[in-house]
């Protein structure tokens, strides 16, 4: 006898349909799984065998062949356990074959209960696009899968395979899970407040500019000056995630297996802070099963690299593609996968190995050559992709004990949202497809958007000649100046905006001492 069910697999960031075929024929009792399965899929036969018996069903003592189509695409993970069990039941006559517009996902425990699987959202989105009307998933994955529900598809949660069988037989229907209304407003409540940061007015201003324009930041200062404090508070003044960004971010976290059980969409902008010992593979992603790395897990959020020169050169060079293209491609012998990596980079470093070069009260123990060698670990091409560089001085005693409250994240966020609203209106016009903030402007778009006053143009010309700026540095300064002008509500770039942008140049601050 023969039966076929619909399921789904993962390829990169997207799902793809898989037909689970079961054929029971005469011969010696045996189970064969074909269709390019990995070891986890091959082991599913033992799980299905035990689950069937523990649920009170009969295991066919005949030759069973399972085919996972298409056969030329590798199938990974335990997601096919549930459809495999149902296919065996249908092929052995213990269950009527389910309709073709039903699909099934889920890992089996030996007692027949269902365990959550990774990558449910991209598979559910593919199911909805492919005309599936009923998707059965483990109960812990239901909230995530329900975010793919449209006017046609319903998501049905099940704690055990027995519940699915009873629902298909019409004995005990399962109530569908409804999607939770998307509300990212409360995400800010879980981020530390900028009011906790004492002093550092220049660095605080740089973080506002970075948030308003989507710019990358480098913080340089001695230990204890507040570099990490500022970085961890940046997500609290960024605009809320749009639903499109939330879906993309949730897909990444779901594939990586980092979605909390029972959670729907990710509503907070990610903040990732890998240790400086992280390898290039940890940042880029990959592995035998193609999992997203830190660059992709920070998508639509902040990637914070503390102690930047301590990262290996190989790891830092991984950042160049995502910073330039907004995505990262991982290639292995088994194939390649491309993941979105549109993150905002915040890097922090000490001015030297001991950390106290230029400190007003503590002596530096590094020689000039040691300082030069330490700073040279950060390559020029990487510095060329950082828009804002801030040198942070030690916090004075009076700043720690002032009675004047510092601006809170809520106050700074109002400035950022106002500037982002200006940019949203500007880039809604034709010719700015894919541009959401000033940092994403191409060289040609910079010329159109960054119109200057005559005095500002003379200042930029003089700076270009005097400082020996490159074309990329020229455009970077204009992007930052455009953000400064947006924060001030100005149409044209004036001298004040350009001077503020010029003071944040990263290349010279790191390479000179």
Residues of each region from the PLM?
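Catalytic P-loop NTPase motifs of RecA-like helicase/translocase cores
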Residues: 111, 305-312, 355
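Conserved alpha-helical scaffold flanking the Walker A/P-loop in AAA+ ATPase domains
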Residues: 208, 265, 270, 280-303, ...
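Basic, amphipathic alpha-helical bundle interface domains used for macromolecular binding and assembly
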Residues: 40-45, 58-60, 67-77, 289-290, ...
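Conserved inter-motif catalytic segment of the P-loop NTP-binding fold
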Residues: 245-279, 286-287, 393, 433-444, ...
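Peripheral, non-AAA+ core regions of ATP-driven protein-machinery
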Residues: 1-218, 222, 228, 331, ...
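Walker A/P-loop
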Residues: 219-260
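Walker B catalytic acidic pair
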Residues: 300, 306-307, 318
């Amino acid at each position: 006898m023969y039966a076929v069910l619909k399921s789904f697999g993962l390829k990169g960031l997207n799902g793809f349909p898989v037909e689970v075929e079961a054929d029971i024929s005469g011969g010696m009792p045996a189970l064969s799984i074909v269709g390019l399965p990995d070891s986890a899929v091959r082991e599913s036969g033992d799980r299905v065998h035990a689950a069937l018996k523990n649920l009170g069903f009969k295991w066919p003592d005949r030759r069973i062949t399972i085919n996972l189509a298409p056969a030329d695409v590798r199938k990974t993970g335990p997601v096919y356990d549930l459809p495999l069990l149902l296919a065996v039941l249908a092929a052995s006559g213990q269950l009527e074959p389910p309709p073709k517009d039903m699909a099934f996902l889920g890992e089996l425990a030996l007692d027949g209960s269902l365990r959550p699987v990774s990558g449910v959202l991209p598979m559910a989105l593919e199911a909805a696009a492919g005309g599936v009307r009923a998707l059965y998933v483990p109960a812990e994955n239901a909230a995530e899968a329900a975010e793919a529900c449209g006017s046609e598809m319903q998501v049905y949660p099940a704690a055990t395979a027995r519940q699915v069988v009873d629902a298909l037989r019409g004995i005990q229907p399962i109530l569908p899970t409804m999607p939770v209304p998307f509300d990212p407003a409360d995400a800010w409540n879980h981020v530390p407040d900028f009011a906790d940061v004492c002093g550092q007015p220049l660095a605080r201003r740089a973080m506002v500019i970075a948030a308003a324009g989507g710019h990358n930041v480098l913080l340089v200062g001695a230990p204890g000056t507040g570099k990490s404090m500022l970085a961890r508070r940046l997500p609290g003044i960024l605009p809320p995630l749009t639903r499109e960004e939330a879906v993309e971010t949730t897909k990444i976290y779901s594939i990586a297996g980092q979605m909390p059980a029972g959670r729907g969409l990710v509503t907070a902008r990610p903040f990732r802070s890998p240790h400086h010992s992280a390898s290039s593979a940890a940042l880029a992603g990959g592995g035998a099963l193609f999992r997203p790395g830190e660059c992709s897990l920070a998508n639509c959020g902040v990637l914070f690299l503390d102690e930047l020169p301590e990262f290996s050169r190989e790891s830092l060079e991984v950042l160049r593609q995502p910073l330039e293209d907004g995505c990262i491609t991982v290639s292995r012998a088994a194939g390649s996968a491309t993941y979105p990596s549109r993150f905002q980079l915040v890097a922090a470093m000490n001015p030297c190995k001991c950390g106290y070069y230029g400190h007003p009260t503590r002596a530096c123990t590094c020689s000039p050559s040691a300082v030069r060698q330490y700073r040279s670990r950060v390559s020029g091409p990487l510095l060329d992709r950082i828009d804002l560089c801030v040198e942070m001085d030690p916090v004075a005693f009076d700043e720690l004990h002032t009675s004047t409250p510092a601006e809170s994240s809520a106050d700074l966020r109002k400035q950022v949202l106002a500037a982002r609203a200006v940019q949203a209106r500007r880039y809604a016009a034709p010719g700015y497809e894919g541009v959401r903030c000033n940092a994403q402007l191409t060289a040609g778009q910079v010329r159109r958007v960054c119109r200057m006053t005559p005095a500002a143009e003379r200042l930029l010309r003089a700076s270009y000649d005097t400082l020996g700026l490159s074309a990329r540095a020229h455009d970077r300064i204009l992007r930052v100046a455009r953000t400064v002008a947006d924060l001030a509500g100005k149409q044209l770039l004036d001298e004040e905006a350009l001077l503020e942008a010029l003071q944040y140049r990263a290349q010279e601050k790191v390479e000179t001492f």
